[in-house]
From Swiss-Prot:
This is Uroporphyrinogen decarboxylase. The record marks D71 as: Transition state stabilizer. Its EC number is 4.1.1.37. NCBIfam families: hemE. It is an enzyme of class 4 (lyase). It comes from Helicobacter pylori (strain Shi470). Homodimer. The gene is hemE. It is found in: Cytoplasm. The keyword Lyase applies.
Length: 339
């Protein structure tokens, strides 16, 4: 698999490419599948439809890897927090974590309740071409904790940060509990058939450097270290969004570092490029215009050269991006990097 070879810095015939949120609303096929499911959460839980959606970008765009269609919040959902997705607003938990008692009341071994995810993986792997990789994923402990404490997405993360500074032992208990779940959850994804795993730390930038390293990065390192110990042949990709200023403190046992669009690739390459393969980091809105897209691709390839790079966006696909430009991006990267 070209994608897996690239994760381990092996020679590849061209630079592989896939896109975060490549299965999404910009594809009419996705919208049809979602309509059949009835809701976003039901789509995640319906393995047949989730498989369909996972495969769509590979078939339509020609990307080098499929990423499991699911949501990071299925873990807290199965730990006992009722979850709903409100149209035009996003996820909302009906209960939140407020103290040590609420942390202790969370169910353990929630990963055993996620068979619908593992079924999607095994179905997808059976239908996916042998040359194409399947990526599994989860959210980081810190990012999941913010949703569980705030109840929804937040601009200030005030409740989470208040807990971090005034009751750090409560937050640590939650992060520890989540870390244990996520290690087993990703392990079961690997056993079900994924070829790589990725951890999304979407709200990494909410924390100052010292707090980030202690309350997020340390837990990411713990998870990735255990996964590499168990499955050395499976690449681990970490994507902490918005921490470009903290790169000099990044270390740990993982293979690929996801670079967001706000971090110049030349900076990431200088600091991390010898240790980790870099993934990223085209600004997604460049896909609105072909000239802007071409300029962005040219700039990235000039910095990254032939090895140590997986092409991706610096954040997820937007719902109204033209699909023909997404397809063109894949063709362009393949053509320009063919060796």
């Amino acid at each position: 698999m070209i994608f897996i070879d690239a994760c381990f810095r092996k020679e590849t015939p061209y630079t592989p490419i896939w896109m975060m949120r490549q299965a999404g609303r910009y594809l009419s096929e996705y919208q049809e599948s979602r309509k059949k499911a009835g809701s976003f959460l039901e789509l995640c839980k319906n393995s047949d439809l989730a498989t369909e959606v996972t495969l769509q970008p590979v078939e339509i765009l020609g990307v080098d890897a499929a990423i499991l269609f699911s949501d990071i919040l299925v873990v807290p959902l199965e730990m006992g927090l009722n979850l709903e997705f409100i149209p035009k607003k996003g996820p909302h938990f009906l209960e939140t974590i407020t103290d040590l008692k609420s942390v202790e009341s969370l169910k353990i071994e929630a990963y055993k309740q996620l068979n619908y995810v593992y079924d999607t993986i095994s179905q997808t792997r059976q239908k996916l071409s042998k040359e194409k990789a399947l990526i599994g994923f989860c959210g980081s402990p810190w990012t999941l904790a913010t949703y569980m404490i705030e109840g929804e997405g937040s601009k200030s993360y005030a409740k989470s940060k208040k807990m971090l500074y005034s009751e750090p032992e409560v937050l640590k208990a939650l992060l520890e509990k989540l870390s244990l779940e996520l290690i087993e959850y990703l392990s079961l994804q690997i056993q079900a058939g994924v070829n790589a795993v990725m951890i999304f730390d979407s709200w990494a930038s909410a924390l100052e450097k010292e707090a980030y390293l202690k309350f997020s990065w340390d837990y990411l390192k713990k998870i990735s270290k255990e996964l590499k110990k168990r499955y050395a042949h499976i690449p681990v990709i970490l994507f902490p969004k918005g921490i470009g200023a903290y790169l000099d403190s990044i270390d740990g046992e993982f293979d690929v570092f996801g670079v967001d669009w706000g971090t110049p690739l030349e900076v990431a390459k200088k600091i991390l490029g010898d240790k980790y393969v870099l993934q990223g980091n085209l600004e997604p809105t460049r896909l609105y215009d072909k000239n802007a897209l071409e300029e962005g691709v040219e700039r990235i390839l000039k910095v990254m050269g032939n090895q140590g790079h997986i092409f991706n966006l610096g954040h997820g696909m937007l719902p109204d991006l033209p699909r023909e430009n997404a397809k063109y991006l894949v063709q362009l990267v393949h053509a320009k990097t063919r060796r």
